[in-house]
Amino acid sequence: MIENLLREEIKGFKNYEVENVPYKYKMDANETPFELPEEVMKNIGDIVKSIHVNIYPDPTAEKLREELARYCSVTPKNIFVGNGSDEIIHLIMLAFVDKGDTVLYPHPSFAMYSIYSKIAGANEIAVNLNEDYTYNVERFAEAVERYKPKLVFLCNPNNPTGSVIDEEDIIRIIEKARGIVIVDEAYFEFYGKTLVPYIDRFENLIVLRTLSKAFGIAGLRVGYALSNGEIVKYLNLVKSPYNLNSLSQRIALEVLKSGVLKERVNYIINEREKLVKELNKINGIKVYPSHANFVLCKFENANDVHKRLVERGILVRNFSNVKGLEGTLRITVSSSDANDYLINALREILS
């Protein structure tokens, strides 16, 4: 009986599943190999003691927004914070998408664009990438003109392919769009190019960011959006009053101030280049160029490779049964030890 009461959009949904097996190295979720910065860890007791857990968190996350504004060279009024960028995608849908509106996004790309579109009852248009997983800008621009979507998502760098779309091409799409264009820059720090300087020039632009990847606090769920003051105001209308807890706000603030980002990002970029170079030497692997902290690889029998990696204690993300990603595994760039262990394991498996 209860199933009959479900909204039609929810019927047939499946839970988001995470592999729950013992592991030596976790390289499946694009997480950083680094723990909290040493100075933050040293002060963690004082940080926790300073938080009054009986009092609700600051609903505006004022201090965190001020620090994020400094980091991004914008003003606090341009910043909206959320419980991970996933929540912000959902809030954008709540604020702007009516049932039957069109949401357009690349395919393959981040799964949450489709999931939240379905929940909103939107009409989904998935624009295929090229066979090599690069953006087909002409195809994308034509789709924006043809379908006149309420929302357009561009993941840059794209997850899970690692491919990017040039700034001038994004601007072209923004100028064609009648709706809002969301540029998801979750992996910005590993790429270095951003649309943030354009948030006041284009009233229909939102840039999404996260502290889960380069800043390494995925477990605290802190994401943020950058846009003009009007869009930020509308997002505040639909968020829950206390959507970001006190501990997340405080530790995020300390991590932003810690000054370790550049060193850690450079480490991951260097490891990424080493990983790509070594993977390309192994017969049976097609490696796609990446501008993020992961590498997408294609195998003749990805399911078997995945199984044998798990047997060796290595978790990678298996996309081989996903339409458009057949035969692929996504590998998170991790510590030097983890990357070397993975390379040696793949040499053994594919020998």
Swiss-Prot record:
Single biological process term from Gene Ontology: L-histidine biosynthetic process
Known partners and oligomeric status: Homodimer.
Cofactor entry: pyridoxal 5'-phosphate
Lineage: Bacteria, Bacillati, Bacillota, Clostridia, Thermoanaerobacterales
InterPro entries, per the entry: Aminotrans_II_pyridoxalP_BS (IPR001917), Aminotransferase_I/II_large (IPR004839), HisP_aminotrans (IPR005861), PyrdxlP-dep_Trfase (IPR015424), PyrdxlP-dep_Trfase_major (IPR015421), PyrdxlP-dep_Trfase_small (IPR015422)
The protein's name in its UniProt record: Histidinol-phosphate aminotransferase
Catalytic activity: L-histidinol phosphate + 2-oxoglutarate = 3-(imidazol-4-yl)-2-oxopropyl phosphate + L-glutamate; L-histidine + 2-oxoglutarate = 3-(imidazol-5-yl)pyruvate + L-glutamate
Family (UniProt): Belongs to the class-II pyridoxal-phosphate-dependent aminotransferase family. Histidinol-phosphate aminotransferase subfamily.
A Pfam family recorded for this sequence: Aminotran_1_2
Residue numbers carrying N6-(pyridoxal phosphate)lysine: 213
Pathway as given in its UniProt record: Amino-acid biosynthesis; L-histidine biosynthesis; L-histidine from 5-phospho-alpha-D-ribose 1-diphosphate: step 7/9
Gene behind this protein: hisC
Alphabetized CDD domains for the sequence: AAT_like
